């Protein structure tokens, strides 16, 4: 294959209805959300979910494909990677969500699981369930970058994520551009939230100099890979190897401590 193939199509997906946003403003100056104030004003909040009404709905899907990978992007759902297929093995190496089912995790309410969610200026970003702008760049080398961008609705800062796939490579790159077009100073976070399929053998891989992990806001700390004591209300006992996903029986988070290395991963 001499160049990356790009397709732009509409695809039907089972979709649960999104509830109407609250009409009254939420003044939540003390609402904590991923180390930001979490104050949604003047944006409206979706505060309920609908689990009764589901229908087939069309969504725009942009596909990038070379000899090894097929990436599916969904600009109408926050500008996310919906799925990524290893063509050699037929394996979806990100979790492919087969239904659009909003949950109340986003800063403004709606959020969906699966694929890769891109977040700015905080996590999970205000517009994670909103459409974004799209532009496609084709290089002379045959590589293609799909840029998905927006002016986020709270601070009006611009964030752009570019998904680049080149011919002959069994990998893709994400690129980012950020702009503050306002006269004010704003804090900024960039977070790429990937969902992966797991099994009893799935193992978290942190760099070799990481010996402890932290919970959100550094509220709790425990040793890694073998944890003990109490962490986020979970009794670890005399020692649990938390590098294996099967040993975590309750919802929680393990954030990698400071490291001189620039990688992490998972292996199944």
Residue ranges, per PLM feature:
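Extended, loop-rich substrate-binding clefts of extracytoplasmic carbohydrate-active enzymes
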Residues: 27-56, 61-65, 113-171
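A short secondary-structure junction signal
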Residues: 158-162, 174-175, 187-190
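Active-site-surrounding "flap" and adjacent substrate/cofactor-binding loops of secreted or lumenal enzymes
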Residues: 88-108
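Acidic/polar residues at beta-strand termini and the immediately following turn/coil
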Residues: 74-76, 86, 119, 152, ...
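A contiguous, surface-exposed recognition patch within enzymatic or periplasmic domains that forms
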Residues: 4-5, 9-29, 62-64, 69-72, ...
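Core domains of carbohydrate- and sulfate-ester-processing enzymes
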Residues: 107-125, 213-230
């Amino acid at each position: 294959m001499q160049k990356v193939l790009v397709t732009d199509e509409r695809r039907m997906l089972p979709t649960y209805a999104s509830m109407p946003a609250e009409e009254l403003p939420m003044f939540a100056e003390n609402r904590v959300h991923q180390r930001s104030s979490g104050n949604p004003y003047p944006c409206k909040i979706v505060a309920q979910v609908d689990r009764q009404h589901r229908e087939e709905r069309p969504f725009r899907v942009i596909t990038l494909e070379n000899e090894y990978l097929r990436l599916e992007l969904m600009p109408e759902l926050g500008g996310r990677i919906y799925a990524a297929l290893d063509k050699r093995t037929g394996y979806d190496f990100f979790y492919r969500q087969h239904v659009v089912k909003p949950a109340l995790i986003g800063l403004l309410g709606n959020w969906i699981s699966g694929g890769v969610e891109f977040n700015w200026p905080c996590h999970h970003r205000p517009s994670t369930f909103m459409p974004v702008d799209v532009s496609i760049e084709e290089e002379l080398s045959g590589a293609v970058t799909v840029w998905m961008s927006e002016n986020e609705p709270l601070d009006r800062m611009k964030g752009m994520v570019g998904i680049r796939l080149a011919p002959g490579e069994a990998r893709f790159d994400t690129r980012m551009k950020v702009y503050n077009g306002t006269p004010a100073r704003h804090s900024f976070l960039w977070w790429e939230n990937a969902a992966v399929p797991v099994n009893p053998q799935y193992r978290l891989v942190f760099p070799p100099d990481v010996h402890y992990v932290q919970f959100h806001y550094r509220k709790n700390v425990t040793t890694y890979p073998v944890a003990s004591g109490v962490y986020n209300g979970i009794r670890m006992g005399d020692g649990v190897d938390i590098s294996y996903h099967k040993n975590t029986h309750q919802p929680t988070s393990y954030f990698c401590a400071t490291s001189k290395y620039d990688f992490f991963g998972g292996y199944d």
